[in-house]
Amino acid sequence: MDRMFGTDGVRGIANTELTAQIAYNLGRAGAYVLTEGAHKPKILVAKDTRISGDMLESALVAGILSVGAEAVILGVVPTPAVAYLTREYNADAGVMISASHNPVEYNGIKFFNNKGYKLSDELEDGIQKVIESDFEGVPSPIGIDLGRERIEVAALEDYTEFAKQTIPYNLKGMKIALDCANGASYKSAVKAFRDLGADVFVINDNPDGTNINKNCGSTHPEELMDYVVKKGCDLGFAFDGDADRCLAVDENGKLINGDFILMLCANYLKEIGKLKDDTLVVTVMSNLGLDIACRGFGIKLEKTKVGDRYVLEEMTKDNYVLGGEQSGHVIFLDYNTTGDGLVTALQVASIVKKKEKTLSELCSVMKELPQVLVNATVPNDKKNIYLEDTEIVEAIKEIEAKLNGVGRVLIRPSGTEPLVRVMLEGENQAEIDEMAHGLANLILSKI
């Protein structure tokens, strides 16, 4: 069997690729593998707003109960709430049912260990081995030893209170727009900002099971960009479906991506003496403009492979406190063990208030190099063709020579979809756009 787990859990089209049977198997194997000691294990289960969440939750919970574990149902809460509440409630593990920013037909199952971290590859492989062994040695308790399901009604409130306490100021006097992507943040984000005194304007906070991420949220921020200007807001935030990431919009309606957010937060933490070793952890996809800006502030960058799990690994290795991705996954390790869209939004808003400057002013210290990202749809078994085909390899070398050190080519297979991402950076937008599309078309012609 191929590896079940991708870069962000098990993901696929719900009911064909990610079936109720697979969810049951993951619940049963996961509860068994992640339980330490002889006590009755407690596993938290949450979901985003997509229609398939009910089906997968029912199956997953059945699997958990079948090995005698307790399933604590959190309902619809953001992914980072699961990471936080797993620690807060002293659970053995947490599970989030979500496909994050993917369209509604997708769903996913992602595990957290008892410390709120995503699982290591070894633990994921251990879960898969149990499933492949047809649950050899896994108990099937009967009678009073079976597991029970319990609904935790305070989950959303507990997470929201935690997020609010990560900033030292209230937000009175600020006008803030939120795009909740019809996803998991539709209650918590609005409540947190209103409780802190902000004047809040909200769009896409009416999930119906089918409209998550649909032309909204961090993958489609255009509506929010217009809305911020229309309502005269100081800034806005767009979350993705499970709210583990967010992007910002300044008062002029300009999109502020994760690179700018990281620069802003790193610079502020350095100023107040809280940026460990003056170091920020980012991925190879971060813009070269971030390197230049951070150098000017005396901030060092550690770079990892793409994926917030690799950022987190680097952060925990050396106890760095801030890291993230251009896509808006930002990890504040002093507060949470995963990317947290609400915590990120609150940090940015509090910095804007503390500095008494507009978001556009605060971001003007960084200049982005033009960057083009083109997705080429490639079957999973052909994702490495860019490394193996001599014509593609030569084309990449030619582009790098043309860029002459001011720019770069980065090709990355997606860990969750049948895509290869072709990214070019350089000084001339039109030139790199043409080269990126040419390279993507060359890759497509070879499959």
From Swiss-Prot:
Keyword hit for Ribonucleoprotein: no
PTM summary: Activated by phosphorylation.
Domain of life, source organism: Bacteria
Record-annotated active site: S100
Top-level EC class: isomerase
Keyword set includes Metal-binding: yes
Any one Gene Ontology molecular-function term assigned to this protein's record: phosphomannomutase activity
Record-linked PROSITE patterns: PGM_PMM
PTM sites of type Phosphoserine: S100
InterPro entries: A-D-PHexomutase_a/b/a-I (IPR005844), A-D-PHexomutase_a/b/a-I/II/III (IPR016055), A-D-PHexomutase_a/b/a-II (IPR005845), A-D-PHexomutase_a/b/a-III (IPR005846), A-D-PHexomutase_C (IPR005843), A-D-PHexomutase_C_sf (IPR036900), A-D-PHexomutase_CS (IPR016066), Alpha-D-phosphohexomutase_SF (IPR005841)
Enzyme Commission code(s) on record: 5.4.2.10
GO cellular component: cytosol
Any Pfam family: PGM_PMM_I
Note on how the cofactor is bound: Binds 1 Mg(2+) ion per subunit.
Annotated HAMAP family: GlmM_B
Matching PANTHER family: PHOSPHOGLUCOMUTASE (ALPHA-D-GLUCOSE-1,6-BISPHOSPHATE-DEPENDENT), PHOSPHOHEXOSE MUTASE
Role, per record: Catalyzes the conversion of glucosamine-6-phosphate to glucosamine-1-phosphate.
Identification of the protein by name: Phosphoglucosamine mutase
Taxonomic path: Bacteria, Bacillati, Bacillota, Clostridia, Eubacteriales
Name of the encoding gene: glmM
